[in-house]
Amino acid sequence: MEEDAFPKAYDPKGLEEKLYAFWEESTMFTAQAASDKPPYAIIMPPPNVTGILHMGHALVNTLQDVLIRYKRMSGFEVCWVPGTDHAGIATQTVVERHLYSSLGKRRVDFSREEFLEHVWQWKEKSEGVILSQLRQLGCSCDWSRLRFTMEPLANRAVKKAFKILFDKGHIYRGNYLVNWDPVLQTALADDEVEYEEKDGWLYYIRYRVVGSSEHIVVATTRPETLLGDTAIAISPDDERYSHLLGAKVHLPFVDREIPIIADMSVDPLFGTGAVKITPAHDKDDYRTGMHHNLPMINILTPTGEINENGGIFAGLSKEKARESIITALETLGLFVKKEPYKLRVGVSYRSGAVIEPYLSKQWFVSVDSFRDSLREFVASDAIKIFPPEFTKNYLTWVNNLRDWCISRQLWWGHRIPVWYHKSDAHRMLCYDGEGIPEEVAKDPESWEQDPDVLDTWFSSGLWPLTCLGWPDSECGDLEKFYPTAVLVTGHDILFFWVTRMVLLCSAMVGKKPFSDVFLHGLIFGKSYKRYNDLGEWTYITGEEKYAYDMGKALPKGVIAKWEKLSKSKGNVIDPLEMIAKYGADAVRMALCSCANRGEQIDLDYRLFEEYKNFANKIWNGARFIFSHISNLTSQDLARGIDTTLLGLEDYYILDGFNRLLKELHSAYQNYAFDKITTMAYEFFRNNFCSTYIEIIKPTLYGKQRSKEDQLTKQKLLAVLLVNILGVLHPIAPFVTETLFLKLKEVIGEIKEECSDAITAHALAMLRADSYVVAPYPQSIDIVIPEHLHESFALAERLVYTVRNIRGEMQLDSRASLEVFVICPEGVSIETYVPMVCALGGISSIENLTEEPKDRIYSLGVVEGIRLGVFVPVEHIAKEKTRLEKEKTRLENAIESASRLLSSESFRAKANPDLVCAKEEALKNNRIELQSILDKLASFS
């Protein structure tokens, strides 16, 4: 293949789509449960059907695909199950907004069935977009096993799991204080609440003691909940209030009397040492109320307004009620003061609304029975967490785990499979079959199903099982691929999802859901902001931001900061835009290269640009090789390689490749994706292209050595290319597959068997229809010459010396140099000559016994070997001028330093270390000056 017939630049447009269609149509991604290969399964963290893929999705699915492609090539029966999540709260919210903006209707304007029909339509449209985007990224999923968390199989699994836990008493229902989102009007689990620190107030309120002229002052951050107070609590050790124990205080506005009680939970140093107890609206108060059997009075509606229990304040929002109550307390002389106070406020992770502790009848999973097994799976390394520092986080969380609220007041989701008898609320039926229970069917008017749905994380917690066919009895996938190999996900959902999968899956089948968990960091983008004309910070977006990302200097007044990706901050990077601009391989490699083991991944446009250039480097490296192996055949490779014809550079690259494979295997075992990428990058770019190919170019062009040597190099290039591209394939599948298919065209059909140590495995790889199903590169079994690395290091130092002299003399990097060497007795550099000539840009190396007298040269010394670079005749005058300038500079420096060091005053006052440094610099300058003088003398 002529080099000119091969496009000079890699253009992924068009190629990627065609390649993916080829892979998918050939069913290369489809797993066989009946295979006798060892299993390797991953279940995809299902993206929500709420929109399009973001950069986090691109990251997590790239990392999984890298593992999947590596393991598939390594001989495993690979099963990567894709899927999407119904995402209860998120999807219902998005669809509600869509219906309101398009039809002007709210959810309550539809029947439940009508609304759900709209959600299903949204799901079908959105899911198709998401799956298309996963294909663009190159994800080699088994599409025949596509799952959805609301499909019939998932619904059967959810109902079965619920009933198993219900029958064992692990699921219960009761009036409990939950995290209530007044915007979405649903309960949230503890870990769905995010906490923010905000500036607030501590209010001091006076309560009058009944039948006495005394009063007690209480400090609170929420005066509006006074309407639901059922006690005042003090510490039993607080002597200030001990005489009031058992007394009652009058509660204004609602005309109730509430007791003063003693409780160990009260901190006597907080506020006045007396606190109001509102069990229905504070978690600590709830526990106190349960302990003392206090009434629990809910004062809020589901939308966060004061209800009928608030008397004259009924119908007001919380905020308005607070203002009105403070005003009314002031009028009654019951308001004392307010002080600034830092508040820790819970907000909904989904709507951003301030969470309200709210007394509500909900379903819970009791976690006490599972705590030991959750802890043991990880503590015993049955499940290994990477990075290991997250193991401590996991165990701490498990030790402090509270019962999980699993009911949600939504329409979109898995309906709770429980029916209530209308005339007897305590009469319940839990049913996991199809349709409705027989008893309900006989008397449907007397029964109603629980209107709530299950928390999305309940169905997601069963994901490893449902992806593999559970609970269906004939389930070969489950037998073959469960437990799965690894879960790859963000560290931010370790508790949301990972722990719940361990809990639910082990409770259902008695086995862990996966062996490893890799937790990647969260992606941060660089944001830039400046003050606008109004004196407000504004974020910079568009072309200006892109220019700064690419290295443009920041002007005065512009501040840069790494922050979580946010549209409002202008630092969101769209993976689909990046694929369109740079190609999928560049995006994949950029993401892998920064997938470190920390909590933060810094990502900007420069990385995509760098790896686009690297994809082009791969292309051009292969392009050069194809131009030199166009006449090579499979028969040539089958005949093997004569190792007696291998040079130092050949052993160097083969040994380097073997070392690379070993290091890559370790990196894959430890999920070190950044190392996988950078090691493959550096080996291809530096070891293979910049060093090895440069060394053998003269042989390839027929300028050095014999035709037999040339053929050996061509064979070795083909072997190395198929192997190195194979190493790169998991991280850059499109460019490597394109080149692999072209290499197969060049080599032709392989009919011959081969047992050669160097070429056999390369031929086995080339027999495959695609890298997707090709065997992974193997270590090449050759005997490495003794002292290979020491010898190669010496050759590199000789090259470095030549390059250094070239730089000193300011010779053109393309100029061919003439060099002489004088070796110590018993030392020869004959083995290194081809390498040193190729890398040093040397036309000839002459072996001498003494320095020449008739030519001008610049000399360097490497391990006793004197190496001289002859100064080209046309460069002598320029070099002499340069040396004269350097001589003058050194003489001035020596004179100045000598004068300073001869000063007794300087020596007396200066730090001894400074004096020593000045003396050392003077000594080095004198040595350098003598070298310059010697060189100038040689010009005469």
Curated annotation (Swiss-Prot):
It is found in: Cytoplasm. Gene3D superfamilies: HUPs, Isoleucyl-tRNA Synthetase, Domain 1, Valyl-tRNA synthetase, C-terminal domain, Valyl/Leucyl/Isoleucyl-tRNA synthetase, editing domain. GO terms for cellular component: cytosol. ATP binds at residue 567. GO terms for biological process: valyl-tRNA aminoacylation. A motif ('KMSKS' region) lies at residues 564-568. Catalyzes the attachment of valine to tRNA(Val). As ValRS can inadvertently accommodate and process structurally similar amino acids such as threonine, to avoid such errors, it has a 'posttransfer' editing activity that hydrolyzes mischarged Thr-tRNA(Val) in a tRNA-dependent manner. Monomer. This is Valine--tRNA ligase. It comes from Chlamydia abortus (strain DSM 27085 / S26/3).
